[in-house]
């Protein structure tokens, strides 16, 4: 892969394929990227020999396109994962040592990689927010706009009207 501004998205799509999301639709849902971006990235990954596209017969004779990662793609993904884990460990170390300026510089340089680090499970959102708070840094300056799930899922909090009656169970009004 070539170092470009699209590289984090390329790695995210490659990681999704490695996790078993083998169609463009599944990748779009899993990554939060647009269908257009996913289609372009898939073509780029095919050109680099990191994935292959196979057509299969689907339900009722419809053709189904499946994507699989190649050995070269697996090696590339392992290398990227190792690099990102090293960078994450460095940021954790800087935060623990209280080196605010170095942490800030490192965090800004990694801003576009945060979504992929979250997607791959390298970093944890709660840990990241805690580190930013420890350094007294504004969270919005270090969070890219396209982080899937960064908006905070409130779950059932929007329903309102629910009271807890202790031993009598929950009553919704």
Over which residues does each language-model region extend?
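Short acidic, hydrophobic short linear motifs in intrinsically disordered regions
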Residues: 21-30
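Short amphipathic alpha-helical interaction segments
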Residues: 30-48, 53
């Amino acid at each position: 892969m070539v170092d470009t501004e699209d590289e984090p998205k390329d790695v995210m799509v490659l990681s999704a394929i490695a996790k078993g999301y083998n169609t463009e639709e599944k990748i779009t849902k899993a990554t939060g990227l647009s269908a257009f971006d996913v289609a372009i990235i898939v073509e780029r990954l095919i050109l680099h020999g990191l994935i292959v596209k196979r057509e299969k017969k689907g339900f009722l004779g419809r053709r189904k396109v499946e994507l699989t990662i190649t050995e070269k793609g697996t090696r590339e993904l392992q290398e990227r994962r190792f690099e990102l884990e090293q960078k994450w460990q460095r940021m954790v170390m800087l935060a623990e040592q209280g080196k605010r300026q170095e942490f800030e510089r490192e965090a800004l340089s990694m801003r576009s990689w945060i979504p992929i680090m979250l997607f791959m499970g390298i970093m944890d959102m709660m840990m990241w927010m805690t580190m930013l708070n420890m350094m007294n840094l504004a969270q919005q300056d270090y969070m890219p706009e396209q982080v899937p799930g960064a908006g905070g899922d409130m779950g059932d909090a929007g329903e309102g009207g629910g009271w807890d009656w202790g031993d009598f169970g929950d009553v919704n009004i």
